[in-house]
Amino acid sequence: MKMFHKIYFGDSVVKLTEEMVKSLENEIVFIATASKDGVPNVAAMRAIKVLDAEKGIVLIADNFMNKTLKNILENPKVALTTANCKDMPYQYKGTAEYYKEGEYLKIAEEVDKALKPDLKPKGAVVIKITEIYNLKSGPDAGKLIAKDE
């Protein structure tokens, strides 16, 4: 797997558990972005693959992104959470890069083919997760679970 062009994939404190991987790959995932001016956007995503759980690397196929893509290109900071917050109550924060060709686009094509064979991605968003937060209600709500230095 090639390295990000701008983001370092080196040693990572943020590791995704098997349960987190299953949740991200099988649930609807919401991605939050913001424009360079701070205007927020949230969009539901389904075509997702965890590329490396040990390094917190996640790929999302770009099938219908408009505001989300514009925001990522202006401001690569993103946050993710799954629709199933009851069982997998986590928020993932990280940095995204966009690819319109190459290895990541090929992976996005495979992800789409498994979901819906007639989908053809425009590109791939690859996210390096740098922080994970607990979203479970109670005294630990909002608590930082893991963070890369």
Curated annotation (Swiss-Prot):
Name of protein: Uncharacterized protein MJ0282
